[in-house]
């Protein structure tokens, strides 16, 4: 496991947990003083943030363990499981917010000291923006699915905090239903984000192929490699930080085994240089052993 990857994803998970804890305490104070249902929505979301980030931290630490005899391909799938668990946490909180928003839109309530809630929400907005910026940087350098799921979660928090700020300002001006309507809208958006996150996690657990741009980059290296007659059966997937690449090379029948091995080994090193840490399996076929309808099926 790349130590740089391990350090970054662990730091991102710890940072998210710390921010969620601080914001939760602040929002309890603000909700207690204002009675705002949109702040209650934010408070519940922060509670889910804490649970999700703690789960994320534990799972990330587990996924960073090296491969062993029982898990020969590593523990990277744990990241997808963490993302799936987060999507379920978030969906539950979103449904709670939707129901609470509906209830309070039918029975609007006057807020107390909304300026307290506005200040706390503004602080939460800035803190979340800084966290999301850091998480985006980590995802760019690690492609961690668990950190990406956490980042999407906190991106929805950004929108939520902005909406709460507007709702509190409108309620301060006497528009009493604004608070509950904004809470309802926030709940719908968070539910959509959670379902999307869960879909991506399931696709990863089902070994979805690498993105098209990465697949094309791999194919371009292979088809232009000297000493081969063609290639076929390229299969790719990802587990945590590790890409898995498998393919068959078509080699001249008269090519010595040692030379065929060297060609495949050089190609493997070239692919690993472009995709560091990739797990690559290359099978070498005599071209005569490959059915004609399968030969050279791989194109860039």
From Swiss-Prot:
Compartmental location: Cell inner membrane
GO CC annotations, alphabetized: plasma membrane
Membrane topology note: Multi-pass membrane protein
Alphabetic keyword roster: Cell inner membrane, Cell membrane, Ion transport, Iron, Iron transport, Membrane, Metal-binding, Transmembrane, Transmembrane helix, Transport, Zinc, Zinc transport
Source organism superkingdom: Bacteria
Bilayer-spanning residue ranges: 11-31, 40-60, 81-101, 114-134, 156-176, 182-202
Binding-site positions, Zn(2+): 45, 49, 153, 157
Pfam family, one: Cation_efflux
Subunit composition and interactions: Homodimer.
Family, per entry: Belongs to the cation diffusion facilitator (CDF) transporter (TC 2.A.4) family. FieF subfamily.
Known function: Divalent metal cation transporter which exports Zn(2+), Cd(2+) and possibly Fe(2+). May be involved in zinc and iron detoxification by efflux.
Protein name as catalogued: Cation-efflux pump FieF
Gene that specifies this protein: fieF
